[in-house]
């Protein structure tokens, strides 16, 4: 993970990073576009995830594993969104970090902690869907809210430990009367960077894709299922994979290219700028995850959709909102209908 890439920088490293920063400076137009993007992203993601988290906490009695994972996903998204205003200030200030060293470390730590936590919670949701649909009876003892909470606690601890180096290593560099926070876009790379990227992203991504391929095969080969239930499962698969492909795949592909460049050295200023711009764009896409997850809730969770209509529609819906999931039982059809 990115925390594993953070090493104590030498003077040579800082000089190289300063050179990269000078070559990668944005134009005023680029700064304005990035700032507008983060402002819109912050508003949409904050409202959507705050509403989702309130609903998940309010409906905690439903006691389903998927609800637990969705609640932790909303917490991760909301925590990640709360550091986006620092990027707004950075771009409005003309690539200058005015907050100092400690806030820079905290911003990097919180952003990457919650980004990778979101990735792993999406993977947990995929695994839960796989067990519920492909092995509905065998997984009854495993798919319990307590186990889901324990899994989430374990993931929070693991990701926090992996990101901890961001809190202890210097992350600011001064260039031409401006201070740059390295954790906003260009993390310091190390020899462990590619290996950490593989552990942090490749494993959960492959796991998620595998789960959904097996789910699709089960839906095609299994007993006859109502069309709307099958469509709901396909909708869930499409949404989660779309979030991975839009938000996380471009960033990690570009990150691998950047790490290889960093270790190679001798890159022209034009190439440095291209890499810097790529970092900014793909990082924007990762932060978009916070705005897209509530869209997923809307399409796959009936209670979220019901509550949102109650808030926005002039005519409030009558009757109690449906649960996010039905009560788990030993029926394959019931398990397939969850979410």
Curated annotation (Swiss-Prot):
Record carries keyword Glycoprotein: yes
GO biological process: negative regulation of inflammatory response to antigenic stimulus; oligodendrocyte differentiation
Topology relative to the membrane: Multi-pass membrane protein
Chief location category: membrane
Transmembrane segments: 37-57, 65-85, 106-126, 148-168, 196-216, 233-253, 281-301
UniProt subcellular location: Cell membrane
Residue positions with a glycan: 14, 176
Disulfide pattern: 104-181
GO molecular function term, any single one: receptor serine/threonine kinase binding
UniProt-recorded name of the protein: Uracil nucleotide/cysteinyl leukotriene receptor
